[in-house]
């Protein structure tokens, strides 16, 4: 069976690893993952949404650090964009880590369009770092 698993967000990825293992043990041949929001690159400084003590606990940021070290932190916007080489590289790395056959994130523009709220009326800090 080929499965498409959709989640509202991927924060640290710890629960997904166990879920993917369970799906394969239960007979899945492929597990494809889609996130309804963009990669979380920054811990929430307003509501503590991500419950992370450090940005490096966030799966996307941790992956960037593993791929490129401190140099990668200057290119977070590229990593958050699946149409760039850095973005594709991050997706491949997360797939390998968590056992996905494919991974896709909603873009920030796509998210804003889907919810119908103007960019200037919603906080996007955890995705873009913009205050």
Label the model's feature ranges.
Residues 1-131:
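PRPP-associated nucleotide enzymes
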